[in-house]
Amino acid sequence: MVSTTGREEKQVLAAHLVRHGLKRSRQREVILDAFLKAGRHVSVEELLGIVRRRRADIGRTTIYRSLKLFKDAGLASELTYGGEARFEPLWNRDHHDHFICGSCGEIFEFKSPEIEHIQEKIARGIGFRIEAHRHHILGRCRKCAAKASRAGTRRG
């Protein structure tokens, strides 16, 4: 789980900045705080809306650059489906997988010990050692499936 204060994440970011000769900035700290507190996968536009409630002077380009920096520092990952990139915090998170709506891009996290057990069993059977993995299961969310069903009914 992401720490509630973001203290560890800020330390990771600070170390990354030092290693790459970059400066700390108040804007990056505000963006990191908002990103961690969002508690969900966010698009650039969503994060911009959250950040601008605190700092109206932070622009879209700064959000993009900060999210790239967070990715480079190992604090965020990017998922792009449905034509829109979404970002999620990575640091100190429990392992989880994703259902992703291919129509609207909404992302649903899930945990399944059963799936984890099955893949470990299969890996052992072929002499494979899993070091990391991600499951991204594409489909349609309830809303998009209902829209598609209604659209099909109207045509038919």
Q: Which sequence ranges carry the predicted segments?
A:
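Basic amphipathic alpha-helical segments that dock to polyanions
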Residues: I63-A73
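Pre-recognition alpha-helix immediately N-terminal to the DNA-recognition helix
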Residues: E29-A34
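Short, Lys/Arg-enriched N-terminal segment that forms or immediately precedes the first helix
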Residues: E8-G21
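A short acidic, leucine-rich amphipathic alpha-helix
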Residues: E46-R52, I63
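Non-DNA-binding regulatory cores of transcription-related proteins
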Residues: D72-G156
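Short, leucine-enriched amphipathic alpha-helices that occur as contiguous helical runs
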Residues: K10, Q27-R28
